[in-house]
Amino acid sequence: MILRYARSEFARIWEPQTRFTIMFEIEAHAADKMAELGVIPKEAARTIWEKGRGVIFSVDRIDEIEREVKHDVIAFLTHVTELVGPEARFLHQGMTSSDVNDTALAVQLARATDLLIEDVDLVLAALKRRAMEHRMTPCVGRSHGIHAEPTTFGLKLAGHYAEFQRTRQRLVAARAEIATCAISGAVGTFANVAPEVEAHVAEKMGLAVEPVSTQVIPRDRHAAYFAALAVAGSAIERLAVEIRHLQRTEVLEAEEPFDPGQKGSSAMPHKRNPILTENLTGLARLIRSAVTPALENVALWHERDISHSSVERAIAPDTTVHLDFALRRLAGVIERLVVYPENMLRNLDRLGGLVHSQRVLLALTQKGLARETAYAAVQTNAMRVWRGEGDFMAFLKADPIVRPHLSDIELADLFDLGYHFKAVDTVFARVFGD
């Protein structure tokens, strides 16, 4: 976990102290149910809570024990015994290490996802506000990076808003899939621990019961979870790349905030670089990098091997922390994005009306020209404009094929910018429901 990207509230989820507290709660809740079932003395279960609740576990001591025993859960339980005393012998009855580790990881991932969903809500709020602000701000739409037809900047942002709505839905679904509890023993048969114990722990920890566990919770759940985070990362990158392109000097339709005192380059004092969105592009790569190892974790040997553990110790904190940072940074960029409507109009007019070529084509076909003939006439004049020979409207008015079919008034109407925005309200109603 890179501290540069970890805000304190999020980092706490992945601190060893938090994990040990969760592990203790799992063990203690299991002991409660075992006491109720008569497996262990009720007084022992009470003592476990009395001596263990709210305790600060010694991470150094647990690490010291683990260096000797080479087993993380045994090291933890040994330290708990040092704190709780003889009653600690009733902990972990019939349980296996993965019962504790997997369930604890599920709690951590669920908590992390709750914060990620809050982050997405920040992005959605910023996108909605700016989309409404620029609902009818004209700009050029581009395909293959080349001018296509007019759109509005609000429509661009509305598309990203809809994408982040889907991102939110995926995170909600991913949380539900990952938030499962397994307390089923060495190979998942409940031979030495009752299913009622699992159900009790699941309820207390806010989890669902894993229907069929082996020694572990099946890793397809984790693969799906990290895939959902990866798609969220790609949604971030798509918007970040859009902003980076719009900030190019020769485009300059929108720009990241640039604060007083900020420096863009150690060598060139004039630079205003899109460093925030470039950073988001890089973080998206890191977030997506978790998917392949998460998928490879699915095919564990038989009832379980440990090959997944080292992977998850890295990708669980790293990926969630990176996504949290990226979402919050993106929300800030959108909230403070500098928009240049005048530059958008200038760029829209840069090709001298070529963005209206489809309307001219359609009008000619509706006047009776064959599509091939109409296309050839419009394209011939458009290519002259591309070569810098003159104005599109003037060429069309002088064209022997176009002129007999379209009057000056009709041609002027075909170049009306507002025509392209007649469905903006419909799209906004679909997206925002307003």
Predicted features, each with a name:
Residues 31-32, 108-120, 229-238, 243, ...:
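Alpha-helical support elements that line or immediately flank enzyme active sites
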Residues 132-154, 253-264, 270-271, 302-311, ...:
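Glycine-rich cofactor-pocket loops
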Residues 167, 215-308, 313:
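Glycine-rich anion/phosphate-binding loop at the beta-strand->alpha-helix junction
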